[in-house]
């Protein structure tokens, strides 16, 4: 059911994307699929297979390095000091980057990068992005601004529209506001909608007051 939902959502996104549109999807490498017994699945691979089936073209995978990781499950319960069934836990996530038909942008626009911030560009193209875990528990799955900010800088013009079909607490929208991008956020939960709207409005209000002050 989950995979059918993912295919339905990203099929609709594929339909409305321009031929040179990009998709950047933050996802765990692996997740549990059994409540017990150590069963895990390579989620990133399964999601990519769905995207490829839809028609997306693969570009790259960015490894996300959490600089302040939460405590991981390091014990191998049920096989302590034994190779019978050790539980190896990989908490890492990635960003799968793909495009519709054309990787090099046909449409022209204004880049975030220039000579003054070229070191930032070089850091991002290395393929490993550092991020700090989000400590504010706004929703069940809110994430750090350190993830959408570099993705938007790297893969969009300032004139582009950024779409987030799982808007949640509005982190992508907030990142777009910080970078001067237009954005669209889709969220079914009214509670999450309210959280996102308040969060972004508060940021915009602060920025406006700063401009008025100076």
Where are the regions a protein language model picked out?
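S-adenosyl-L-methionine
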Residues: 201-214
